[in-house]
Amino acid sequence: MKSIIIALLLIAHLSAQSQNDQGTIVYNRQINYVKMMTDLPYLSEEEKDRTKLSWGSGTWDTNYNLTFDPNGAIYTYGKTEREYNYSWRQDEFLIIDDLKKAEQMKQFVIGGRLYLLEDEKPRTKWKIKNEIREIEGYLCMKAVTEDTIKGQTIVAWFSDQIPVAAGPEGYTGLPGMILMLDINDGAAIIEATTVDLAVVQHPIPKKIKGKKLELTEYDALIEKFMAESIEGERNPFWEIRY
């Protein structure tokens, strides 16, 4: 009898694990503009002081939804934007990851112009660390990577309890779901606030607009914008995503 109970418990555990590969995660994306701009060496002290005066210790918070299954993930604006009557922005920021083909589609705006990146997704060079923490009841491990174009250090916390190699902001490639990102030591924090593991229907728009770019063109666009902003002593992240 005892062996039967153990077997049933094991089956239930395996069944629960198998059901963890699709659902919807709500993330809160919090930007600390004062920290972000303080860390930019090419900005004038006057510009940094104006930011401190405008923002103080405040942050800018936005909710995003990630719907996922073993084949892919979609990341876009969540309820916060609709509550503040900005639902039109949902059609202007969208990331679709095809996890099977290792391809990505990203819709975004730079300088008031709508772009659409469609290409193979480059493999992120993650370094997994020997640190753990709990997020929304899931045990997570730490991984670190660098964005050399934007000058960012990205810390990710991922959990293999959700066995899908996806995450917010288009970051993928870890052995489990990314539940938190920390960009440049707190300048931006993207953290899961709700995890709903249920069968999902991906909310893909019928037509996704934007000037089409390949990955090399996208990288060149970001590099050019960063270089022009640095030369002009401007904050590039008023226009491009931090």
Task: Locate each region found by the language model.
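Bacterial Sec-dependent N-terminal signal peptides
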Residues: 1-25, 240-242
